[in-house]
Amino acid sequence: MIKFLESLSSTEGDALAAFCEGSVFGLKAFGPVLSYGLGYDFVSAWEQRSEGERTAFLSKYYGTVTVHCTPDADREELLSFLKMVGFSALFGSAELLKNSYLHGTEGCVMALEKGRECTAKGSAEPDLELCWDNDYADFYEVLSESNPGYLTGDYADFLTDFSHRVRHGTAHILLLKSRGRPVATTAALVKTEGELFLGGVATLPEERGKHYASTCLLAFCDRYPEHRVFLCCRPEKQAFYEHLGFAKVNDFLELESSQK
């Protein structure tokens, strides 16, 4: 049975966090609730239970639905619910979604069990500066230019959302500068006490091949050496992340409304 969550007590929140731990789908689904709670109309959440045990958790954040479930989940009920609730974008395991959403885009979930296991060397360039949780405009500009379409909102929307999450310690942005010029980005889209979900890994086209991306990733891993680290990538990038110590642990599927 799927139930809408109107609120969460501290104890219920801790139990939900534990349920979502160890999965990029759980981490991404839990992120909006961790950052905003359930008191805003742009964050909604549901859980599925069977015989009293939680088997799935879903969140909807500005129209994007993320699904996290266990092997014991009632998958037919979940898929029926997704059709009913509606979404502008969908994210979950390819195993769960691919037969129902044939036009979705699949990719690889990569993970490090501990940040300290990262084998990235980074750039040896002497004049590099790591700028944490600042320079939002430069971060937005570099990411937008390097990866068109990654950011779906305008700068005002980005600033409002990310600055809120950074203030609450549930996200971080990192901008890399070379000789004072912004050249690369990486973000912790979700940060919990023991896990990171990284994204926004981007380098300006004319600056690629200089190990700037691995420099940013290494900076996060050095800062959080005991955290489990997740990121998602296209299949053609799998080898790059494996070279940095990451291992593929799952396949994801994402769907935009235009692909329905």
PLM segments and residue spans:
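A conserved beta-strand-loop-helix scaffold within acyl/acetyltransferase catalytic domains
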Residues: S59-Y61, Y150-A202
